[in-house]
Amino acid sequence: MLTDEYVKRVYAQVEKRDGDQPEFLQAVREVFESLEPVVAKHPEYEKAGVLERIVEPERVVKFRVAWTDDEGKVQVIRGYRIQFNSAIGPYKGGLRFHPSVNEGVIKFLGFEQILKNSLTSLPMGGGKGGSDFDPKGKSDAEVMRFCQAFMTELCRHIGQFTDVPAGDINVGGREIGYLFGQYKRIRDEYSGVLTGKGLEFGGSLARTEATGYGLCYYTAEAMRVLRNDSFEGKTVVISGSGNVAIFATEKAQALGAKVVTASDSNGYIYDPNGIQLDVVKDIKLGHRGRIKEYAERVPGSEYHEGCKGVWTVPCDIALPCATQNEIDEESAKALVANGCTVVCEGANMPSTPEAIAVYQSNNVLYGPAKAANAGGVAVSGLEMSQNSYRLSWTFEEVDGKLKSIMENIVANSLEAAKEYGHEGDLMLGANAAGFVKVANAMVAQGVL
């Protein structure tokens, strides 16, 4: 519940203006609830109108994308790029291609990105983009033509010192390659305008693994500091089967845990003997198949239709890595009832407010997405650095920097939580630590 008059007033304005964007309202309210002790301690933020400004994007770009499918039919859909806040660096955030994409979804993701990027301590502002294009069932040629059409419009709004997009759901190495090629062709320049590129043309080692590995580094450090515990011997439930889920599984297994689930939009698999990651990689990365194929190939494993059931599997640690609001109150209660004591988020905002309340009332160690999944954008920032210097670091160098960044996020979040009277609260601490850096920059730069 909001109690601070300044916070309540600004949230009411957001609600009135953006009432048709539920994901954005949810993200703003969660952050605002954490920021009440912060704005009470910093009256200069109200004087400078920081809250009013930070919830309003600096620029919203919405554009038509027209492309031709394999049958020669013209398809027309929408593209978006929301350049939310550049107080601490150029806009930075991924591109998502999914039928669920609309302005409200991109807006919530861009808002979260401001604080997430701030937490990495790297000089990156917040932005997000995408389209309601669905690459599933499309040929490589169709995906290429769509990416080229999308970049033809987007290219006039981005640049290595202005806005540096990356991948997100359904935008992986293939799509980034097509987007980069079209940008290079139109602008006639070879620059670090996108991250997540192939190693052959400016990409960074460990970028593919970064979000999943970073999630586990964050979780391990939070468990060590707050619970004097580790992954060793724990049973882990993970949703999703994309890059984040796959590499979270890989790192959790390396840290001594047994991961027993994976899922996609149709259902989930349960393997009591532990997920065979090589099989998942072959299905999902090798030929873009469906996760049910795992149960056909691995004796003793089970496939279940529907995604919610994954949260009924007994576990010690849950790492949601699929999509927003995948864990509701009912699912959170099922996790707690089945022994889960740690939830750290690999997806963006995968827990509803009601689910978070269940975690908090049951002493579950909860790591919010903007902190726990910041590894991807952290290594994107490191890729930008390598592009600027025209050099390439080794996998071990990048991975070491990633681990250090994630451990620092835990430390900075806990320090902020203590400073504002909520010791041990990783969610409030992440929101406060990320916000204060951006707010101070906004105050210093004047009313813009």
Model-assigned labels for residue ranges:
Residues 106-109, 179, 215-223, 248, ...:
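Buried hydrophobic packing segments
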Residues 203-312:
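Glycine-rich phosphate/diphosphate-binding loop of Rossmann-like nucleotide-binding domains
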Residues 1-205, 437-446:
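N-terminal ligand-binding/catalytic initiation module
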Residues 2-27, 222-223, 334-448:
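Adenosine-phosphate binding glycine-rich loop
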Residues 162-166, 190-194, 238, 261-264, ...:
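General beta-strand structural signal in soluble alpha/beta enzymes
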Residues 142, 174-181, 205, 247-251, ...:
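Short acidic, glycine/serine/threonine-rich loops at helix termini
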Residues 267-366, 371:
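Rossmann-like adenosine-cofactor binding region
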